[in-house]
């Protein structure tokens, strides 16, 4: 499952669980985006924070794992590079790429789109009432699903934190605590940065 996960919320987790059940998946690998090419001018939380929040959120489900491949690759993240690397790591696996239906609608603009269909089956998930369309996409390469919990959005969660409103029950408890501890989404610099080991680096502070 690819995504910015800024922050990860219960909608992501329910969507992953529903897709896993429908397609009898053995494992769901969450792949936090390193540097999204579509959001190159948008302020997002540092990759280490997004990675750690994803680890925290998925820890209790033995079917869920988290991969750093997009974060560690460097440069802009393209789905084709993600899938090529996953294919190299798991050559015998049948890959399903889970993404938001809104992102899937833009897939024809993605890098090396013709190769994508040979690497994975794409599953577009959306909230009820959102128009789903697979126009222009190969019928045997794409599935669409509605997931009620996707009425939660990362954008709304960030806005609530910025306004001092609670995000309990919208995101997992451990993620709430991580956001609070590191003061994410309360300032342009998103609080404190983390190094590759998950250790805090002060940003604009004399001490902590």
Swiss-Prot record:
Enzyme Commission number(s) of this protein: 2.7.7.18
Any one GO MF annotation of this record: ATP binding
Pathway the protein takes part in: Cofactor biosynthesis; NAD(+) biosynthesis; deamido-NAD(+) from nicotinate D-ribonucleotide: step 1/1
GO BP terms, alphabetized: NAD biosynthetic process
Keywords annotated in UniProt: ATP-binding, NAD, Nucleotide-binding, Nucleotidyltransferase, Pyridine nucleotide biosynthesis, Transferase
Domain of life: Bacteria
Enzyme class, UniProt record, top EC level: transferase
Reactions the enzyme catalyzes: nicotinate beta-D-ribonucleotide + ATP + H(+) = deamido-NAD(+) + diphosphate
PANTHER family membership: NICOTINATE-NUCLEOTIDE ADENYLYLTRANSFERASE-RELATED (PTHR39321), PHOSPHOPANTETHEINE ADENYLYLTRANSFERASE (PTHR39321:SF3)
Cross-referenced HAMAP family: NaMN_adenylyltr
Function summary: Catalyzes the reversible adenylation of nicotinate mononucleotide (NaMN) to nicotinic acid adenine dinucleotide (NaAD).
Family: Belongs to the NadD family.
Protein name from the UniProt record: Probable nicotinate-nucleotide adenylyltransferase
Encoding gene per record: nadD
């Amino acid at each position: 499952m690819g995504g910015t996960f800024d922050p990860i919320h219960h909608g992501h987790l329910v969507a992953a669980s529903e897709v896993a059940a429908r397609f009898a998946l053995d494992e769901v690998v969450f792949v936090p985006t390193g540097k999204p090419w579509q959001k190159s001018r948008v302020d997002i939380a540092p990759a280490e924070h997004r990675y750690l929040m994803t680890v925290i959120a998925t820890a209790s489900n033995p079917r869920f794992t988290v991969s750093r491949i997009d974060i560690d690759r460097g440069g802009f993240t393209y789905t084709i590079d993600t899938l090529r690397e996953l294919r190299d790591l798991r050559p015998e696996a049948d890959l399903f790429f889970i993404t938001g239906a809104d992102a899937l609608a833009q897939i024809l603009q993605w890098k090396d789109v013709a190769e994508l269909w040979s690497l994975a089956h794409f599953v577009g998930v959306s909230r009820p009432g959102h128009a789903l369309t697979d126009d222009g996409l190969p019928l045997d390469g794409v599935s669409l699903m509605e997931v009620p919990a996707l009425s939660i959005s990362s954008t709304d969660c960030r806005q609530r934190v910025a306004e001092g409103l609670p995000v309990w029950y919208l995101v997992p408890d451990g993620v709430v605590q991580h956001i609070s501890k590191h003061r994410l989404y309360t300032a342009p610099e998103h609080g404190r940065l983390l190094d590759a080991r998950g250790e805090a680096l002060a940003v604009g502070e004399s001490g902590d």
